[in-house]
Structure formats: C-alpha cells, structure tokens
C-alpha cells in the first residue's frame, strides 16, 4: 500500500529528531486516511515527543502554527496559512502539485534522507531570515471585508431572475 509506505517514510524521517516535538492532526476525509491515522497512532505511542490530535479547532490550530518551527506534510494549510506566520513548510509528495505557493514552501519527494535534510534546512538561520521577507501569494488578510465593501457599491439587478432556453431534444 503506497499510502502506508509513504506514511512510514515520513515517520522514519522524523524519528531521529529527538530534540523536537511533533504535533500530528488527523488527515482529511481522503482515501486512505484510516491507514495514515493507524500508522501515526502506533508511532505516537512509541515516541513521547509526538502527539496526535483528532482536531485542534481553529484557534488552537493557529496557536500551534504560530509557536511551531514549521510544518511537514502535504496539507494545503502549509501553502495557505504557514506563510502568514513566517514559518517554513516541507511539502511532501504530489498532493498539492499545481497549487500556488510561496518561497517558504520546500517541495520534497517521499524520501527519508531528503526529508531529514530539508528539516535541517528549515531550521537554519539563513532560511528563517529569508522567509521573514516573504509574503503569501494568496494576498493579505481582510479579503472578505474588501469583497463586502465592493459588493455594497455595485448595483446588482435581476439576480433572482433565471432565464431558461428550450432545447430541441429530437
């Protein structure tokens, strides 16, 4: 099973990092999430510097991001939220391929040595200085306020009127 193999590669890569704590959250409803949860559960039971949470809730999640050293995985959160906290992301595999991301994101394959080397890079003073200058490609906070302001200025007419067309089915 590729999902199990990839999960084990990640866990093997971080196992040697005994001087750090690792927080895991349950994966989304993707295919194979049960395998990922099972493997992480086993790993957390054997490694007292690792913790697994089903869900942290938004406030706790953002607090963890703020006080973390970075993110490792293939979550869109690493591409979307982490740049706002000026933290690096190690994006593993192809799951987020094709998405826009900032220079605080380092893409790697599911390879133990590559992941370990990238963890070390993520923590270097040089990389940390570099990402302080980076802005998220997704813009700045406050988009919803701007959208509401623009919509209030626009005159929107006939939004409830639907136009139908007869289609010849013969």
Show where each model-derived region lies.
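Nucleotide-activated sugar donor-binding and catalytic core shared by glycosyltransferases
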Residues: 1-170
């Amino acid at each position: 099973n590729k999902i199990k193999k990839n999960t084990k590669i990640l866990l093997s890569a971080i196992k040697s990092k005994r001087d750090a704590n690792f927080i895991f959250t349950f994966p989304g409803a993707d295919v194979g999430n049960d395998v990922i949860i099972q493997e992480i559960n086993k790993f957390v039971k054997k490694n007292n510097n690792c913790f697994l949470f089903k869900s942290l809730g938004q406030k706790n999640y953002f607090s963890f991001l703020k006080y973390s050293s970075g993110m490792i995985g293939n979550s869109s959160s690493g591409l979307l939220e982490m740049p706002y906290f000026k933290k690096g992301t190690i994006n593993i595999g192809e799951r987020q391929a094709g998405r826009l991301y900032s220079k605080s994101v380092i893409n790697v394959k599911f390879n133990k040595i590559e992941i370990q080397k990238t963890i070390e890079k993520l923590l270097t003073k040089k990389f940390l200085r570099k990402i302080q200058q980076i802005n998220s490609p997704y813009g700045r906070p406050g988009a919803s306020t701007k959208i509401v302001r623009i919509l209030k200025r626009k005159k929107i007419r006939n939004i409830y009127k639907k136009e139908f067309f007869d289609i010849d089915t013969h």
